[in-house]
Amino acid sequence: MFRLSIALIFLTTFILHSQQKEPPALDPSFHKERRQMVLEQLPPNSISVIFSAPIRNRANDVDHPYHQNPNFYYLTGFLEAHAALVLLGTPMNVEGSPVQEILFVRDQDPYYALWEGDIKGPKATQKEYAIDKVLSTTKFKSFLSSLQGINNINHFPFFDDVRDHPRNENDLFSLLTAFKGFISAQSELSKPEDNSLTIDQEYLPDVVGSLREIKTAKEIEILKQAVAMSAIGQVEVMKAIHPNMSERELQGIHEFIFKKYGAKHVGYPSIVGAGAHGCVLHYTANTADQVGNQLVLMDVGAEFQNYTADVTRTIPANGKFTKEQAEIYNLVLAAQNAGIEASVVGASFSDPHRVARSIIQQGLIDLGIIESEKEVRTYFPHGTSHYIGLDVHDPGTYGPLRANS
């Protein structure tokens, strides 16, 4: 099994090394096509608003590295904070031209540039991102006030951790405050008996989630790159692991490989669990100073060009499975292979899980670990699969499997 893995990773390593430079990220035409697909599904006289992600605080005056809202990135490609995308179901004249899409971004700020780096500003953003109209966030509130005849308002559920930045009057907090005020004003103007206004925070997530489920060829290429570098990390750990190593050291090898091959971030906190730690589904502490002569579960994924892999492997720290460990390992491997075989277009999303669960269930009975089918949940309390993409648990319909989902 290890020889096969190493052979496959040698091939992916060659592929990654053979590229002279990082392949280009998704170009503006991709995001424009996504916006058009959303616009085609919006009712007339509607407004849909999608906000950038908030800046999240780590402690005191130190923030976490910024990570864009995946839905906002999917529709714009824009990676800066404090921004809002407006999509209109009916074209509206804005500054002399009829438009259906408007992106509001911050103006350039020399003070901010000194401390944090340049921001693009409306003019450069308009040129780079192929959006009908790009305006300063200073105009967002007045734009909303100018809207007439709106009878449908769509948005994603609001973030609950948006901080007010007192020195920035046009931050995300201000944008959200203005939009919430707009909703309240429209609600007061509408007549309840006429049902003349619809405010919906489910329609837009459903529309965008269904689109995100189906990947383009370029998205699949990026995901393959993310998976390849994540798999290389697994093999590098297989070569380096020793019982005296800590979980943190193994995590460091994985994340070094991610950076080496071009990933800027992890797709989610790396899980490296030795022994009982490997039984904690979302164990991210990685605090064991020695992994010992135990099995080590490693659930890790590189985030490459905003798309994340999710690769899990379990290996013996001393390089050799015991008889009991091998029995469980091979049982899980058989379930995985059966789940892969069941993952075909037209099958129910739950089919791979049912097949894998059945094999685990019977295997545990055969090994004498459980006596009845209902006990399998003790050892298999979760689903078998999920979509991956801009999120490690990517949205989708979770209905019949579709091509390129």
For each of these PLM feature ranges, what is it?
Residues 10-17:
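Hydrophobic h-region of N-terminal signal peptides that target proteins for export
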